[in-house]
Amino acid sequence: MPLPPLSSRTLLLLLLLLLRGVWIAISSPPAGLGPQPAFRTFVASDWGLTHLVVHEQTGEVYVGAVNRIYKLSGNLTLLRAHVTGPVEDNEKCYPPPSVQSCPHGLGSTDNVNKLLLLDYAANRLLACGSASQGICQFLRLDDLFKLGEPHHRKEHYLSSVREAGSMAGVLIAGPPGQGQAKLFVGTPIDGKSEYFPTLSSRRLMANEEDADMFGFVYQDEFVSSQLKIPSDTLSKFPAFDIYYVYSFRSEQFVYYLTLQLDTQLTSPDAAGEHFFTSKIVRLCVNDPKFYSYVEFPIGCEQAGVEYRLVQDAYLSRPGQALAKQLGLAEDEEVLFTVFAQGQKNRVKPPKESALCLFTLRAIKEKIKERIQSCYRGEGKLSLPWLLNKELGCINSPLQIDDDFCGQDFNQPLGGTVTIEGTPLFVDKEDGLTAVAAYDYQGRTVVFAGTRSGRIRKILVDLANPSGRPALAYESVVAQEGNPILRDLVLSPNRQYLYAMTEKQVTQVPVESCVQYTSCELCLGSRDPHCGWCVLHSICSRQDACERAEEPQRFASDLLQCVQLTVQPRNVSVTMSQVPLVLQAWNVPDLSAGVNCSFEDFTETESILEDGRIHCHSPSAREVAPITQGQGDQRVVKLYLKSKETGKKFASVDFVFYNCSVHQSCLACVNGSFPCHWCKYRHVCTNNAADCAFLEGRVNMSEDCPQILPSTHIYVPVGVVKPITLAARNLPQPQSGQRGYECLFHIPGSPARVTALRFNSSSLQCQNSSYSYEGNDVSDLPVNLSVVWNGNFVIDNPQNIQAHLYKCPALRQSCGLCLKADPRFECGWCVAERRCSLRHHCPADSPASWMHAHHGSSRCTDPKILKLSPETGPRQGGTRLTITGENLGLRFEDVRLGVHVGKVLCSPVESEYISAEQIVCEIGDASTLRAHDALVEVCVRDCSLHYRALSPKRFTFVTPTFYRVSPSRGPLSGGTWIGIEGSHLNAGSDVAVSIGGRPCSFSWRNSREIRCLTPPGHTPGSAPIVININRAQLSNPEVKYNYTEDPTILRIDPEWSINSGGTLLTVTGTNLATVREPRIRAKYGGIERENSCMVYNDTTMVCRAPSIDNPKRSPPELGERPDEIGFIMDNVRTLLVLNSSSFLYYPDPVLEPLSPTGLLELKPSSPLILKGRNLLPPAPGNSRLNYTVLIGSTPCILTVSETQLLCEAPNLTGQHKVTVRAGGFEFSPGMLQVYSDSLLTLPAIVGIGGGGGLLLLVIVAVLIAYKRKSRDADRTLKRLQLQMDNLESRVALECKEAFAELQTDIHELTSDLDGAGIPFLDYRTYAMRVLFPGIEDHPVLKEMEVQANVEKSLTLFGQLLTKKHFLLTFIRTLEAQRSFSMRDRGNVASLIMTALQGEMEYATGVLKQLLSDLIEKNLESKNHPKLLLRRTESVAEKMLTNWFTFLLYKFLKECAGEPLFMLYCAIKQQMEKGPIDAITGEARYSLSEDKLIRQQIDYKTLTLNCVNPEHENAPEVPVKGLNCDTVTQVKEKLLDAVYKGVPYSQRPKAGDMDLEWRQGRMARIILQDEDVTTKIDNDWKRLNTLAHYQVTDGSSVALVPKQTSAYNISNSSTFTKSLSRYESMLRTASSPDSLRSRTPMITPDLESGTKLWHLVKNHDHLDQREGDRGSKMVSEIYLTRLLATKGTLQKFVDDLFETIFSTAHRGSALPLAIKYMFDFLDEQADKHQIHDSDVRHTWKSNCLPLRFWVNVIKNPQFVFDIHKNSITDACLSVVAQTFMDSCSTSEHKLGKDSPSNKLLYAKDIPNYKSWVERYYADIAKMPAISDQDMSAYLAEQSRLHLSQFNSMSALHEIYSYIAKYKDEILVALEKDEQARRQRLRSKLEQVVDTMALSS
């Protein structure tokens, strides 16, 4: 059979297929496709769907949802529903409330299904949810009966994460007969690594209630079948998690595709941008210890774009063709994977996505190569999220094959190179979300779900000639606008695909062949399922086509489509039964017979002969109805119809043509068909014989009768004249036929004129006149027809027209008349001053009628009617437009005839309009003195009749400008500016330039020019230049400032609703440079804008634009708009903000108030409006602001997720209810409020009587109360008077004392600048805080050790720098009972000294310990406020030490000075009054316990002390008291003489004698005890100055101590008693330099006498409490506390203000404080502690109570000073006040409260406010970056590197290793991380070496 001739249509289809970009998406069916059939669906109206599985045998569908599990038939009919929630739960409850009561409030919690697996062997469904910490249910497959729900062990809790698509599992059936199955499950853990492993292998028992259900497959004390995310990883990257996207088993391996935070790209800073990476994870099925764990980065790349965010995957076998192309066996597996572009936005990834292909062979090969290289010892483990990622691979001789499953080393292992897939298909518009694939008859078909709810069908063909590896041949809608979720599953028979969105499951057929209605469309679709079933004329699968295996009955290639031709291809409608011959190609055996069918009109029999088909056309009678009303032809389909199937299976176009419809000769003979024109009959026919006269038959257009174009026909109205026409082939009318006529189709009055045929080529319309109505048209073109024999129209192919014209119409002036078309015979009649024909004008003289033909014609009396513009610059260049009459007929008439005053104005020829308009350019008028002038036009010459002057004068002006507004704008330009000045509308043309670039002109008036700024070159000022014609304007004082373009940093909140209108706070830079910024959003192809209000350069508030779209609306969980951005003048970069994650949520939906629309309500009853979407699930704290109006009155609102509770205003009557939120407004109906019903008369009487009685009782009570209160008032007034007197006395005393103290303090500190304060050096300061009471600590000394010991200690030091070892060491020590509080503090201090040079590392350890401590505190159900309150852990003491190290600089520069001033002030004030040397009590005190409670008489003496260093130097005056003991006087003298000298560098009072000099020779040594000492009844009183009768002004000296006779005799007893007391002090607390040695002088215990000084101490030893003898017990002396407090108030305030302030005289807040406070806030956030009191308390316990209180109570830790007991007592009161100020609890005070609390009761609220402000200010400060903190800590380490001997510190720490060696080694052995780092063996090495050396 010959090859068919390819029709043009077939060729076109082939060409399209070759050129087709195989990446197309068919969005709507093209012509020839049937409509998309409705798919079967299951709709879940209430709960969101999450997972779907299909039973491989029954085909039943199981769907997991929120709070539900559904069982559906294969056709999606609901069979069963099982309820799983909501449940009463709280995510914080671990274990769940069903197991153990929970302290957290429970609420109704949704249970989100996260895992749905079929257990075929046990005939059950495994469904795991999010509630109760992630427990699972087992459901019977038949009826979803709950078989079990294990929930009582920790193994039963998989994860409480609520995200549905983040968990994946593989169920591994047990060996046949054994029954035990395994579940491999991977899940994110949301930071709860202590509760949940991220990956685990669990037992699945046959009995659902078995206690071992979900137990780890293997577990011992060291390893188990699980993998946890290390807490260190989570502390560094709190957002780290692993999300499991897809899992599968292949051979003996289980694989997971995961998404996890990319720790290499993501900054640990929580505020930074998060990057994610996709990993493929592999485990051996039979590896219970997870030694085989390997993970590799996975992704693919296309055209330089990386796709790294895995969305879904599907394991499949390749089709035969694909397997061959990949070089695989057909039973090998491939993985189809969908990735989104980039590495950001895991939750809402970019729309651009790619479908990629991986072979499992390549994946296994990559993994094997990595394992082999590691076992060769190459590289590191490189698992970024495990601590041992830097651990090197260990060389091992093991043979690694494909089935290798790991050892206990070199694991877990991470891949370093990304496994790259083959990109098949890229979707840039819609975003792929799900994938499934299968092999159909050797072809690989992939189905991809999209974000818009479509299913793309893709054919994979790597050998495609176009070079594209995949063809998207069809796209069908599953559910418009809703993303397809991951579980895209094929039915068991592979006929259907189940696609799931959040609310619907759709059964999508894998093919829709039937939609294609032709072979070309069917096979052109490239759907591999579809072929053309020829004789059935249907597109179908091959198996659906009857006898498809027979030759040419089923076409599977476009070239196999049936081709059909017919001869002849057309017949006339008048012809009947014309024989037709049809030739067909690609047809099967037609022996069963065929018919010819002309569409559905008629059918004829056919005969098959010689491979051809013979049939006849229909009869003329049958054709008539087919062609009626169809014009000159009707194309019909001629079909071959099979007698076997009764179907039409091939077609060809066939034409019936109709000549008779043509009414003109040219139309007849120029057609496509063989028609003839009979010119004498004036008809068109297909039959030549129909023409009566042979010569009348026309076949060619040249022979047709027709009018030819000649000269134009101009006919003046009202003039009689003939019209001659040229023609061709004009027929001679035959006998009986009428002659020719001309038809003029004049509107309103058509004219028919007899015509005379001269010959076949000439015709004349006879004499006639013509007219038309009206004078508003000067000439009228009129259609002209020539007819003969009444209505036979001669063809007029050129549409020749006649022009009728009237001379006077619209030509009122001479100029207009003469400029008319010269072919009109119009001229100007001078006498009558009108336009007329020549013969209508009286002919007085030849010049009485002028015509344009006369070359010398010109009109008289030119006139100027208008000038534009009327002003211009003197520099000239203004184009002046002069409008008028008779302004010359030709340009030459006016070329030199226009002047403005004396200035020539040169006409522009191109803009000259004859007689009407002259445009001329004014010359330079700079020399012209006049300010204005008349415009003169002369036509040829300036004689009187040819000269015109303007009615207005033209003014010459000098334009200027003086202001531009706005004066600044963005560098990109686009700002509308107004330039203000004068005469700015002068001239004809204006051009503005800014910085040399044109400013786009808009409009101007005399005072302003508006233009749009161009882009600037650089930021800064740019000059403005205005060119008005030739005048150039500039003003150096007016400049336009270009600023940097505005930027947008943040939109808050980042969401709105469908209707927009919500307020958005936009922060950025340079925002105020744009006057009217607008915000824009594009959604679903529709763009809308809204306005913004700028507040300053960094803030503006915008109303969100609406995105209301009839075709699309955002889902409940929100959706990003296609674009969001800002219109900021011409700043293009802000039009689309790519970085914004702005979301739109649907509008609220409110229910009507009632079915009738009217709700009746009682007054004061709340109005409840129910609805949904009321609170969009947006992140952050922002909420939708509602306004509810009752009528026009707003009501008070309470908003919840499903209702608005409105406290209705006090209204009655009927009112409309309106709800507004942003741009959303809705009225749910009308509200009818009824007033309360009136009371009845008996009720009113009863109420009145009762009220009267009640009134009488109240009056009686009031009278009694009045009397009682009058007595109380008298008593109160009396007490008030007494208190006022007391207060005024105390105030006076305070005032005097403060003034005196200020003077003394000034004297003391006048020479104390910063350098004068005796600060201790860093080392001494640190030692006193770290090791209080130990003067000579080993860490200060060099240690002499053997070389091997030094080596061991060095190794031990390296171990301490391994975080895991150090943490294990500390935790193990703390777990020992014998490890005391003292030990804890000592270890903390030793560790900090050892790590002084590694402060960054020490900080990391401290943070981890604190994090653990917080966890422990919260787990043990302690109140969170107790955290850090005491020093019960190493961490707490380490924290104190950490602040000690890092705040030294701050103490020296800022806080030290007010602390030292307070210390000096207290010491000075105490020493102004008597101080008892024995009891330590004083007249002036802040402490009630140290207050002398009796009157002591004393005098102040001034002693003149000889300077002990320089005898000849002036004496130093020193104030003392006559009641002071000798030692007290010595102390005061030493303070005065050695003022400014550090205490440690001056003599001690005990080493000096006091010498009283009375004249040159008389010198008396004064002592506390000597022979003159008075003894009374066993009481011995110390000697005082009064005892020695020392007078005021006496001269004294301090001399080195001498031994007198008395001293020798008495020193033994006194020294014994003193030394005993001092040794008691030493053991109790502190070193010699720290002890409060004076004034405490110890009684002589052994001699039996009791010492006293000012008051006898009855509490001494054996005396009872309270028997105080002579002491007055009255509390009256407590007012002295108040006086002392008032005196010292300023110094306390100064200290507190310095400590609680963030700005200190140029010094910044120490980084350590900000860093630690931020850390505590992070911990609170992590544990969801939102109680501000708890956060406040943590900070107070951390810094003020742990560091500052210690420093305030012990200033000797910071300064080289001596602190006596009374100063110590006063500082303790200040420290207690400091502690109370930091507390959040209210102190309820009463008369029994301690005096020190009452003393500062009024001040504490003020101090508290300082503390709160301090904490708030710190919180507002920008976070410290890790880099800044690292640099700071490194600098601190460098500064103090060699302060302590680290070897000694290590030796001290090692003593604890030695003590608890076994426990530490066991702990290291148990810990998996420690085992991996081989820490135990390293420690054993240290222990062994140290043991040998000892």
UniProtKB/Swiss-Prot annotation:
GO biological process: dichotomous subdivision of terminal units involved in salivary gland branching; gonadotrophin-releasing hormone neuronal migration to the hypothalamus; neuron projection extension; neuron projection guidance; olfactory nerve formation; regulation of smooth muscle cell migration; semaphorin-plexin signaling pathway; T cell activation via T cell receptor contact with antigen bound to MHC molecule on antigen presenting cell
Cytoplasmic face residues: 1264-1894
Claim: RNA-binding is one of the keywords in the record: no
Domain IPT/TIG: 862-957, 959-1043, 1046-1145, 1148-1234
Membrane topology of the entry: Single-pass type I membrane protein
Record domain Sema: where: 28-510
Ranges in a coiled coil: 1262-1315
Subcellular location: Cell membrane
Tissue specificity remark: Ubiquitous.
Membrane-crossing residue ranges in chain numbering: 1243-1263
GO CC aspect terms: cytosol; glutamatergic synapse; membrane; nucleoplasm; plasma membrane; semaphorin receptor complex; synapse
The keyword Signal is annotated on this UniProt entry: yes
Glycosylation sites noted in the Swiss-Prot or TrEMBL record: 75, 658, 670, 699, 1041, 1185, 1210
PANTHER family per UniProt: PLEXIN (PTHR22625), PLEXIN-A1 (PTHR22625:SF35)
Protein name: Plexin-A1
Native source organism of the sequence: Mus musculus (Mouse)
Origin organism lineage: Eukaryota, Metazoa, Chordata, Craniata, Vertebrata
